[in-house]
Amino acid sequence: MNRTRALVCLFLAVLILAHESEAQCRRLCYRNRCVTYCRGRGKRSVEEPSGGAQVVEKRAVDDADIPSAVEERELDEEESIEFR
């Protein structure tokens, strides 16, 4: 029983690591504000420099809020967002 439990735990750990490695992150910047979206992790960080310091805020976000490739292409055409 302990051997089976250990194998199940190992299998779950591998699945979690595989999911984390598939996270796709994109960094979008507009004026003085940069947003990093990580698709696989479901998190994003918002960076807004104020004065000389940077404030980084992390919060959970739905994958539906992440721009698709088509939306990113439209933003590129408008040239309103700089990709870094």
Swiss-Prot record:
The entry's keywords: Amidation, Antibiotic, Antimicrobial, Disulfide bond, Pyrrolidone carboxylic acid, Secreted, Signal
Proregion span(s): 42-84
Modified residues (Pyrrolidone carboxylic acid): 24
GO CC term (a single one): extracellular region
Source organism, top-level taxon: Eukaryota
Keyword Secreted belongs to the record: yes
Compartment(s): Secreted
Disulfide bonds, paired cysteine numbers: 25-38, 29-34
Keyword Secreted part of the UniProt annotation: yes
Tissue expression per record: Expressed by the venom gland.
Residues recorded with modification Arginine amide: 41
GO biological process: defense response to bacterium
Signal peptide: 1-23
Function: Antibacterial peptide.
Name of the protein this chain belongs to: Gomesin-like peptide
Organism: Hadronyche infensa
